[in-house]
Amino acid sequence: MSNPFAFRSAQVTFWTTVVYLALLVPLVVINEGVPPVQPDGSLFLDRGLNLTEAWLDLGHITERFHHQNSRENDVVRDYLRLRIEQIIAANDAEARTTVFNDLTSNVTYLAWGSAVPTHYQGNNLYVYIRGKDDDQGEWWHNARAGKLIGKGGVLVNAHFDSVSTAYGATDDGMGTVTVLQMIRYFTKPGNQPQRGIVALLNNAEEPGLLGAAAFGKSPLLPFIHTFLNLEGAGAGSRCVLFRSTDREVTSAFSNVQSPFGSVVGSDGFKMGLVRSGTDYSVWHDIYGQRGLDLAFYRPRALYHTNQDDTKHTSRESLWQMMAASTTTLINLSADTGSDYIGDRPDGDRSKAPNGSPSDGVWFDLFGSTFVLFGLRGMFAWSLTVLIVGPLTLFGMMYLVHKQGKGYAFHTKLRATSDSSSEDGDDEDGEVIRLGGWKGFFRFPFALIVAGALVTGAALLLRKMNPFIIYSSEYAVWAMMISLFYFGFWLIMRGSSYTRPSALHRLYVHIWLFILGWVALVFATVLEDRMRIASGYIFVFWESQVFLATLVAVCELFSLPRKIDFARGAAEEAEVRDHLEAVPHSDAVIAPSLEEATSPQRAGQSSNSPQEDDEDDVPDEETPLFRKAGRGNKLDTSFLRRGYRRSVSAIMDSNNEAEDGPKRKQPFEGEQAWSGPMVTSTWILQFLLLGPFMVILGGQVGLLLTSAVNQTGVDGSSLLAPYLMIAALSAILLMPLSPFIHRVTKHVPLFLLAVAFATLIYSLVAFPFSPRAPYKTFFRQTVDLDTGDTQVHLAGVEQYLRKIIADVPSALGQEIACDASSSRRDLVDCTYDAAQVPPIPTYGSGKKSFDLPPGVSPGPAYYGKLLTVTVVNTTAKIATQGSKTARLKIDAVDTRVVELRFSKEGPPIRSFRVVGADSWDDRFGAFPDDGARVLRLWRRDWESSFVVDITWKVDGGNTRGLEGRAVALWSDANDAVNTMPAFREVVRYAPAWATVSKAAPGLVEGSKAFKV
């Protein structure tokens, strides 16, 4: 019966194909799907969570756009406040909770990510749920800066505002209703946390993490040591552990129902590869808290668009976030040890005294198991593999050499009847070819060829159809994997066919070990110097390659000693030479070993043995020598050696060969000495190399692809995603490389057809669709002095012009497209919007802004929307070399105003809103070179901004300030009347396109001012 694990073509093809399919298919299914509501989820449902209630809440808060600068935002806030009160009352938890309706906090600071000096007036909602170990009463009134309050609390946070162009179901409606459910769960009798929990619903995250900055003024801030931030950067799908500060807090997430995530995402933020941010950045970077970012992350094409609604998410997605949040908060609040208490390693007393964290490494397996361990442990592991691995393999190779079985890296030796010489000093010895180097350089050559194929494909797609990955990422994956597989197989199989080598597997393993060792060196340096843990893939890989290579080296022990093989080879050569030189020598010369082990004895025919025997008997007419010809010359070297064997010895040898076990023959032309070599160990090597690496590489590859495949429209690199998939395809197929030369042609030829089909598709298919729409960024500007208005669409010019071509008000216009000032590698296309002017006050009930039917707004209307009054100026030239002016700014139906100062004038050195708190240094000092933009946010809709600004004045230069005041309008709920240009673009854009905001304000109205 044939060995099912033999190193033969059929078996290798079958097992490698089955294993890859059995792993890759589930990985894709898990990446695309969302876990169902687990039956054991009823434990949470019975104890406090209510999925139906959460889904209804989500529908209520996402009925309309609710940007912070919209009236609907107030409606959502009022609804959330009511729901909090209802939940607390239903659980009879008034005595265990305190609701904070923040209408007083304000912060003046350097806004995160923009370096723009900003004033913001907060209106967050948050609930303190008292823990069993917390102090009684309203202890926060007596809290002092730097004082440890109890054992530290836990923050769970989500923002309830949306962007101006989205309903915010995923960003961040599901996080918001999850916070409501956390309040419901932990206020239910029997669920009181051990340490207190602060449930925060913050406002104005979208314009720049403003709500998190305002929370810095909360009396509860010193109490919070850890946090769970809930976010959404897609539209439904799975929620992923976006990032985490350390191993200890990550352990609180490790036993959730359906864990999903990798430390690779966290390292992407740490290295600055991800340019966007969440409230996590404020909690950790500014306040020093330790925690996690749990977020939805795909599909990004629907992010910040009107398709971020309940239609494009699911109850399963919501349940996954609710269940994961509950488990994580239970674990964080139940930790009463010293993990989150103690002095900080950086000694910063302005931040939470939450102990010394340790870096971690984490990843999930098939979305069901979570692996977590320390980075320092992995560093020690990495060093061990780097040092012990090569030493062990060198030691084993030395033992093989000492055993006389070192065929690898030896091409020949000279053999005599009693000795073998590898140095060739015995000139009388016969040269025995070993073929030791045969096949050594196949792997790097095949890797270069296959790598060139996928790199060329990446460059071709970048040039011909750069956005195809936007909607067809799996076609790109299929093309890259198929191309690399076929290219690599073609070289390896072709080389093996023309020059078979029994050392092929060993040499490929050696190359894999060398490449893995180099990669591990870089990964280890990153672990030690930058605390980057993403190299865990290479740590596992090199460990697996080391073991597989060790097996390959051990296989050499099954070979005969080189000296024995050389003697046998020399004897067979001598016998063969003598048979050709001496007449009828087969009657007196022993047969070769091959002849002895065959069913037909030398000189005996299977058809007529008696007749053959008679023909072989010499008589007086038999010539002494055969006729001259090839092989009939007497081998004088053979005679010189004087080698003779008796007839009895010949017969004994024949009998032994016939009665004993058959000698294993080399595989299809491989080296003659390789017959006894153990080869069935290949399946062990493949299992060491393949499955775990495919799981790790596949999961990371799919996660990264989902994260970056739709970022090109934002101005990110168009080539990087293709090169990433090309590299990951090579990594995924590396476990197959030692065995691919035994794969039959059927799989590679099928994959060649797949590669050809997907390449053609990727080159000619239109890259966008209603399910993966192209995203353009809208902004309308109005000169409030003249009434001139323009629409600016940011994006890729090729597609912008197609979109604008269908916009009625832009027909017949010459469209100007220039490099975007705010988005890298994109353009701003501009057209006149006089036919669709904005009317921000439409429906506001303000009679002074009513327009007669059919009358378009002009300078008289726009001039009343924003006023800037210089209250006074004060010169301090003699003492400080500066001037100060007080400005009063009024804007209609907006909460936000910007002051943009001319570049020709002096920059602003400081500013302060009258009645507000002073500058908050936690976010950074006021820019040393001054500022030319100030941004002001108010809590209500009517109050005036009164601002003191200071600028430097040179000795003889007393020039004043010039600039433009800009009012931002963001409420698109009645866009057909208030923002008809925006409504027009949304309505007439092709089905394959969608519209998002380009800035916090959809409409920017500016007016000149001078001080």
Swiss-Prot record:
Spans within the Vacuolar topological domain: 31-378, 461-471, 527-536, 704-719, 769-1011
Subcellular location: Vacuole membrane
This protein's record includes keyword Aminoacyl-tRNA synthetase: no
Chain positions of site Transition state stabilizer: 303
Cleavable signal peptide: none
Active-site residues per Swiss-Prot or TrEMBL entry: 205
Binding site for Zn(2+) 1: 159, 171, 231
Biased composition (Polar residues): 595-609
EC number: 3.4.-.-
Single Gene Ontology BP annotation: proteolysis
GO MF entries: metal ion binding; metalloexopeptidase activity
Biased composition (Acidic residues): 610-622
Annotated glycosylation sites: 50, 106, 331, 709, 872
Primary location recorded for the protein, binned into one broad class: membrane
Residues exposed to the Cytoplasmic side: 1-9, 400-439, 493-505, 558-682, 741-747
Alphabetized UniProt keyword annotations: Glycoprotein, Hydrolase, Membrane, Metal-binding, Metalloprotease, Protease, Transmembrane, Transmembrane helix, Vacuole, Zinc
Region (Disordered): 595-627, 650-671
Function per UniProt: May be involved in vacuolar sorting and osmoregulation.
This protein's name: Vacuolar membrane protease
Native organism: Pyricularia oryzae (strain 70-15 / ATCC MYA-4617 / FGSC 8958) (Rice blast fungus)
Classification of source organism: Eukaryota, Fungi, Dikarya, Ascomycota, Pezizomycotina
